C-alpha cells in the first residue's frame, strides 16, 4: 500500500496545487489528509496564496482516494463543501501487505491525540506492535521511533504554512515513511 500523507494546507492554493502535482507523480493508492485543510486559524498568518475555494476544488477532485481527519481549524462548514469525510478525530489503517507483517497506522491531527512533540498534545492512543502514530498540527517534520512507546512517529510537516523552512508531504510504503519537499 502506498500513501501520500499531507497536513496543514490551511487554504494555501499554490501549495495545494504543488501537492496535487506530487500526488499525480507519486500515484498512491490513497491520500491521507491530517487536517487543517481550508482555514488558516487565529494563530497563523494568512498564507499569501490563501484561496480556500480553489483548495476545495482541488481536494474534491481526488475525493475518492482521500482519507481525512479533523484538525483544530476545521469547522462543520468544511464538511459541507468537501466531498469526503473530514470530521473524525482519528482514523486507523491496517497495511496487511507490509514487509514483515501487518502494520497499523493511527492517523490524527495532533491536537486530540499526539506524541507530545513540539506543540502536539501528549496523549498516546493504545497501539498494537508494529504501529505508527501519524499526525500533523505542528507544521514540523518528524520521522523517528519513540523509545517509550515503541511506535514509529511520523509528521509530514506542513504543505501550506511550514514552520521548519520547507513545505513538505510524506510517503508511506510497506512500513516505511519518507519526507518529500513541495
Annotate the PLM regions.
Residues 2-96:
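Core catalytic region of metal-dependent phosphoesterases/phosphodiesterases
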Residues 34-38, 63-64, 97-104, 136-142, ...:
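Short C-terminal domain-edge/linker segments immediately following a structured domain
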Amino acid at each position: 500500500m502506498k500513501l501520500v500523507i499531507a497536513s496543514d494546507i490551511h487554504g494555501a492554493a499554490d501549495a495545494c496545487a504543488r501537492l496535487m502535482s506530487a500526488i499525480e507523480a507519486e500515484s498512491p493508492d490513497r491520500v491521507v489528509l491530517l487536517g487543517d485543510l481550508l482555514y488558516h486559524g487565529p494563530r497563523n498568518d494568512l498564507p499569501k496564496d490563501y484561496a480556500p475555494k480553489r483548495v476545495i476544488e482541488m481536494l474534491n477532485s481526488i475525493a475518492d482516494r482521500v482519507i481525512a481527519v479533523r484538525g483544530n481549524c476545521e469547522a462543520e462548514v468544511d464538511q459541507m463543501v468537501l466531498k469526503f469525510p473530514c470530521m473524525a478525530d482519528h482514523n486507523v489503517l491496517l497495511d496487511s501487505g507490509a514487509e514483515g507483517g501487518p502494520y497499523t497506522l493511527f492517523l490524527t491531527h495532533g491536537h486530540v491525540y499526539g506524541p507530545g512533540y513540539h506543540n502536539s498534545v501528549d496523549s498516546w492512543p493504545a497501539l498494537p506492535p508494529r504501529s505508527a502514530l501519524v499526525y500533523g498540527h505542528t507544521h514540523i517534520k518528524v520521522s523517528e521511533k519513540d523509545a517509550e512507546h515503541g511506535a514509529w512517529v511520523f509528521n509530514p510537516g506542513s504543505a501550506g504554512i511550514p514552520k521548519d523552512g520547507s513545505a513538505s508531504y510524506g510517503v508511506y510504503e510497506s512500513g516505511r515513511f519518507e519526507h518529500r519537499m513541495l
